[in-house]
Amino acid sequence: MAAPESLRPRLCRLVRGEQGYGFHLHGEKGRRGQFIRRVEPGSPAEAAALRAGDRLVEVNGVNVEGETHHQVVQRIKAVEGQTQLLVVDKETDEELCRRQLTCTEEMAHRGLPPAHNPWEPKPDWACSGSLGSDTGQKDVNGPPRELRPRLCHLRRGPQGYGFNLHSDKSRPGQYIRSVDPGSPASHSGLRAQDRLIEVNGQNVEGLRHAEVVARIKAQEDEARLLVVDPETDEHFKRLRVVPTEEHVEGPLPSPVTNGTSPAQLNGGSVCSSRSDLPGSEKDNEDGSTWKRDPFQESGLHLSPTAAEAKEKARATRVNKRAPQMDWNRKREIFSNF
């Protein structure tokens, strides 16, 4: 086994030959990413030091860890006659996972940073061989990883922040499409596939793409972005809690159990999106709430009078009527189609 200080990603530059590049790419069930399955002897891939078992991290400077096999193949074919691949072998991949570092092109030149180095990003993706759980991501070689949002502080460089933001028609929200290697975004811990929750302390989940971009540009030379990776996003959605800066280092919401209201989850706020919440019997669709019975709150359960029973029956019939649609919401729904 190689010493940790000698481990580093490899940047392989391939020039296409008459028979192609000479390597085979495939995905592995249960593991995230694309892997080099075979390298042909005497091929450009072998000359570039590409090896079977390597995991592909970047293609021509773009992180592809969250992309499908087809998308990765198209990126390799996009530049005719040559390609540049950032890869990690199994040992390096495990070391990066153990230290919760994200692989970058800079590491191929400088090696892995010392453990005390301040530019190490905060924990992000779990290792590719990890198993999910309700409260965190359980790594086969270590303790469970807490699923938390990440607060990324970016200072604008000469080339900007170094990330690309996009919206996806198939799902609401704004997503990080790519992060430039060695950029302020990369050093802040921002990653491709992250979903943007807040910009400079303001929730932007309901804003349009142009509005989010304007918020990022509002402060000229810096931005503070609260983001969640796909696993953390799913976890918080299951709990029906909107991630906030408090969840970065503070108490995390607990899984919902019988008799527990989502609003009681360790101070977490309930997700405002109606599509994420099942109907509640205690809340009317028009936003009003049931009046509390002071006797019941004190522990006394009294039988209703005839008048009370009649009033309750009338209220139940009223509440079964279909709610009036908010016209702003209606336009939103239509625009999504």
Swiss-Prot record:
GO terms for molecular function: molecular adaptor activity; phosphatase binding. PROSITE patterns: PDZ (PS50106). Pfam families: EBP50_C, PDZ. SMART domains: PDZ. Its main location: membrane. Keywords: Cell membrane, Membrane, Nucleus, Phosphoprotein, Repeat. Scaffold protein that connects plasma membrane proteins with members of the ezrin/moesin/radixin family and thereby helps to link them to the actin cytoskeleton and to regulate their surface expression. Necessary for cAMP-mediated phosphorylation and inhibition of SLC9A3. May also act as scaffold protein in the nucleus. Residues 112-145, 242-337 are annotated as: Disordered. It is a peripheral membrane protein. The keyword Repeat applies. Homodimer, and heterodimer with NHERF1. Binds PDZK1. Interacts with SRY. Binds ADRB2, SLC9A3, P2RY1, P2YR2, RDX and LPAR2. Interacts with MCC. Found in a complex with EZR, PODXL and NHERF2. Interacts (via the PDZ domains) with PODXL (via the C-terminal PDZ-binding motif DTHL); interaction is detected in glomerular epithelium cells. Interacts with SGK1 and KCNJ1/ROMK1. Interacts (via the PDZ domains) with SLC26A6. PANTHER family: NA(+)_H(+) EXCHANGE REGULATORY COFACTOR NHE-RF2 (PTHR14191:SF4), PDZ DOMAIN CONTAINING PROTEIN (PTHR14191). It comes from Mus musculus. This is Na(+)/H(+) exchange regulatory cofactor NHE-RF2. GO terms for biological process: negative regulation of phosphatidylinositol 3-kinase/protein kinase B signal transduction; phosphatidylinositol 3-kinase/protein kinase B signal transduction; sensory perception of sound. Residues 327-337 have a biased composition (Basic and acidic residues). Residues 255-275 have a biased composition (Polar residues). Residues 11-91, 151-231 form the PDZ domain. The modification Phosphoserine is found at residues 130, 183, 186, 254, 269, 280, 303. The keyword Nuclease does not apply. It is found in: Endomembrane system; Nucleus; Apical cell membrane. GO terms for cellular component: apical plasma membrane; cytoplasm; endomembrane system; nucleus; stereocilium; stereocilium bundle. The gene is Nherf2. CDD domains: PDZ_NHERF-like (cd06768).
